[in-house]
Amino acid sequence: MDNLQQVVSALQSGEVIAYPTEGVFGVGCDPDNPQAVEKLLALKQRPIEKGLILIAANYQQLQPYIDDAQLSDLQKQKIFSTWPGPVTWVMPVKKDISPLLTGKFTSIAVRVSDHPLVQKLCHQFGKPITSTSANLTGLPPCKTVTEVQNQLGEHLSAILEGETGGRENPTEIRDAFSDTVLRQG
């Protein structure tokens, strides 16, 4: 029996949680709750300028954040051909989206994950969650629940129990306009 409902409740309460992704554990929160995002950035000691990735169960969950009218049909086809899967796309962002999510950029990084637990979590929560690697600055990203508990346990309200997808590398990041690979996967 998984602890999915406990994790969803923590998200709904504005807490920071950890969960397995394609390659490593991620830490995340409700992207629409500024206090939760600030908590996450403080936990990670992550500069606001960097922005965060949104991870979702499907494209519809990402649409409130993306200005996809700026993308051509061909660009959308290319994006959809990689999802669900381990490719994060940097896409045009809607004007009212918080700089806590976008950082210094006029775009937002988004992914439709094929990890079954991420799928379940985002479906149950009803929207995307933020995603950044579960580790303290200077330490390697966590790949097991035990590693997450040892590094971050006291700072997290819940950890979604399960295993990562087994990828050795982080997910690839690509630019939706140019199709340039920004981070090799």
Curated annotation (Swiss-Prot):
Domain YrdC-like per the UniProt entry, residue ranges: 1-185
Catalytic reaction list: L-threonine + hydrogencarbonate + ATP = L-threonylcarbamoyladenylate + diphosphate + H2O
Family annotation (Gene3D superfamilies): DHBP synthase (3.90.870.10)
Domain of life, per lineage: Bacteria
Main location: cytoplasm
Tagged with keyword Nucleotide-binding: yes
One GO CC term on file: cytoplasm
UniProt subcellular location: Cytoplasm
Record-listed E.C. numbers: 2.7.7.87
Alphabetized PROSITE patterns for the sequence: YRDC
Gene Ontology MF term list: ATP binding; double-stranded RNA binding; L-threonylcarbamoyladenylate synthase; tRNA binding
Record keywords, A-Z: ATP-binding, Cytoplasm, Nucleotide-binding, Nucleotidyltransferase, Transferase, tRNA processing
GO BP, sorted A to Z: regulation of translational fidelity; tRNA threonylcarbamoyladenosine modification
Protein function: Required for the formation of a threonylcarbamoyl group on adenosine at position 37 (t(6)A37) in tRNAs that read codons beginning with adenine. Catalyzes the conversion of L-threonine, HCO(3)(-)/CO(2) and ATP to give threonylcarbamoyl-AMP (TC-AMP) as the acyladenylate intermediate, with the release of diphosphate.
Protein name: Threonylcarbamoyl-AMP synthase
